[in-house]
A protein has these predicted regions:
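Peripheral terminal and inter-domain segments
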Residues: 2, 394-537
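Bacterial N-terminal signal peptides that target proteins for export
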Residues: 2-18
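Bacterial N-terminal signal peptides
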Residues: 14-28
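Boundary at the C-terminal end of the N-terminal hydrophobic targeting segment
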Residues: 28-34
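Short, conserved catalytic-motif segment at the N-terminal edge
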Residues: 51-114, 134-136, 143-144, 150-151, ...
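Short, small/polar residue-rich loop motifs at catalytic or cofactor-binding pockets
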Residues: 75-78, 364-367, 457
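Short, surface-exposed loop or secondary-structure junction motifs
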Residues: 95-100, 153-370
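Short, well-ordered beta-strand elements
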Residues: 368-371, 376-385, 520-523
Length: 537
């Protein structure tokens, strides 16, 4: 995601890394001057593999126990995990049930929602178009999709597919997500993100589902196809990913599908929700089986070739696997930077070995992880049907831990579960609307608040009173979402947030004019970027 003049810095960083890598290899494998005054002409390269076949066999043999222990500790309903090594599937197993309380077992053909593991699939699809000359990573989204627009004219004209798919457009994390929760479709969301504020272009990293989607849709528009049909045509069918799709309806139609589960406050699990991510399909709307994803993993490790057939040109598939943006600088001199490619997280060990992966998470009930190490010709896929609690990542981390160290050296389930708990705690609302004042100021007569309000981003809002109770409705025309309003204090009411991004109770703060009627209402939950004010019409 370089947008500044970075070629000088990147050049010297690359040279420094190569020198360090070569020095480490030479010290490990080459003669010393004391032993032999004949110097090597070049450093030892490439870096030797981290694992051998025996190490992989040991880690694979440990997987059953790793998974069973993780599921027992957490109560996770179901999981599927597979390993690819040297272009062969050496492990593919399902554990647990498709839906809690029902007998259907998970197997390698069970279809899961992938959440953000959809992103590396999407970048592979765009890479196919790049390889065919249909689009270029550095072609502008506007040139491919004239409807594309952001709030800054310069960014609108200059943002490339690369900018959008590496999260460096300036769109803030969560932009457009709450529209999706309200039921708005992709066209509506993409046509309204030009109201979202932007942070500095190509300078800031903000993980943005709708920004990523905009980049992928620009490519599909240039190809003259819907995203869903394009995925089928250029990837899923050629790669033999028989169950894979970017249509939520296809997921629902599968009898052998993993229902999604949320963990309740008492620690039990329940299949309460559905999660239709069609609006952001390239970023989060794919569904596939473990067997599909193992073919996808082989394609990545094979540089675009699968079963001897070139599906994506290697030079077009390489950029997604390479650093394109730095999500955050190292926090200490001893730490290392993590990078983002196009739909992939990219990191390197001390000797320069790449580790590439991505996680997916729906709070409503799914968590996934894919990780591969191209230098080791090794990849692992973990799919779960429970909300993100760190298990998907922990299984992959424990597998690699055993491969490298002969045993687990970290309590990965505990460690990663704790991180997820911390992230949720950090998202707690600033105001606890459940803590109603002991002596709240009285509300106006409810008629003061009722009526129609307008908002150019979220659309119309209707406030109604019935049987001494206030409610509001908003969302997609013809299918609005209703919210009950409970009095909190004075002209402030509370309502329960909904959908993937739900965060407990939020506030509806009315401003009442001199005529005794509310002039506007601010919904603080929808006002994160200043777009939550609804004005009386």
């Amino acid at each position: 995601m370089p947008g500044r003049s970075t070629s000088y810095r990147v050049y010297h960083t690359a040279i420094a890394a190569l020198c360090a890598l070569g020095l480490a290899s030479a010290l490990a494998a080459g003669p010393t001057l004391a032993e032999d005054t004949k110097l090597l002409k070049t450093p030892v390269s490439p870096v030797p593999p981290l694992f051998d076949s025996a190490a992989i066999d040991k880690a694979t043999a440990a997987l059953d126990g790793i998974v069973e222990t993780a599921m027992k500790r957490t109560g996770l309903p179901g999981l599927a995990v597979g390993v690819v090594y040297k272009d062969k599937v050496i492990y593919a197993e399902g554990f647990g049930v498709r839906e809690i309380g029902k007998p259907g077992k998970i197997d390698p053909d069970t279809v899961f929602l992938l959440a953000s593991v959809s992103k590396p699939i999407a970048s592979t699809i765009v890479a196919k178009l790049v390889g065919e000359g249909v689009v270029d990573w550095h072609g502008t989204a506007k040139s491919y999709n004239p409807a594309f627009a952001l709030s800054d004219p310069y960014v609108t004209e200059n943002a490339t597919i690369a900018d959008l798919m590496s999260h460096r457009s300036g769109l803030r994390t969560g932009s457009g997500d709450l529209l999706e929760d309200l039921g708005f479709d992709r066209d509506y969301i993409l046509s309204h993100i030009d109201q979202q504020p932007l942070d500095p272009f190509r300078v800031t990293y903000h993980y943005s589902n709708i920004g990523y989607t905009a980049g992928a849709i620009a490519a599909a528009t240039e190809a003259g196809k819907s995203w869903e049909d394009l995925a089928d045509e250029v990837l899923f069918k050629p790669a033999g990913m028989a169950s894979a799709s970017y249509r939520h309806a296809d997921y629902i139609s599968h009898k052998d599908r993993a229902h999604i589960h949320a963990r309740l406050a008492d620690g039990t699990w329940a299949a309460r929700f559905d999660r239709n991510a069609d609006a952001e399909a390239p970023a989060g709307g794919a569904n596939a089986s473990l067997n599909d994803m193992l073919r996808f993993m082989r394609l990545q490790l094979g540089g675009g070739t699968l079963d001897g057939k070139e599906i994506v040109k290697a030079d077009a598939l390489a950029p997604p696997h390479e650093p394109q943006m730095i999500p955050g600088p190292p926090r200490s001199p001893a730490a290392r930077a993590g990078f983002y490619g196009f739909g992939w997280n990219v990191s390197y060990d001390d000797e320069g070995r790449a580790r590439i992966g991505h996680s997916g998470a729906f709070e409503l009930g799914t968590a996934t992880n894919v990780t591969f190490m191209p230098g080791e010709d090794l990849g692992i896929v973990v799919l779960t049907n429970g909300m993100p609690i760190g298990v998907a990542e922990a299984v992959g981390a424990a597998f690699l831990d055993v491969a490298q160290n002969g045993k687990q050296t970290v309590d990965w389930v505990g460690f990663l579960g704790g991180l997820f708990d911390q992230m949720r705690a950090a998202e707690a609302p600033e105001i606890d609307y459940a803590d109603v004042p002991a002596s709240p100021k009285p509300a106006q007569d409810l008629a003061a608040y009722t009526g129609a309000y307008g908002n150019s981003y979220h659309g119309p809002l209707t406030v109604s009173a019935d049987d001494r109770k206030l409610s509001m409705s908003m969302g997609q025309q013809g299918a609005p979402v209703a919210f009950a309003l409970s009095h909190f204090d004075g002209d402030t009411f509370s309502f329960e947030t909904i959908g993937e991004n739900a965060n407990g109770l939020a506030g509806a703060i009315f401003t009442v004019g001199s005529n005794g009627k509310a002039e506007k209402v601010v919904l603080d939950y929808y006002d994160r970027t200043g777009l939550g004010t609804f004005v009386r019409e």
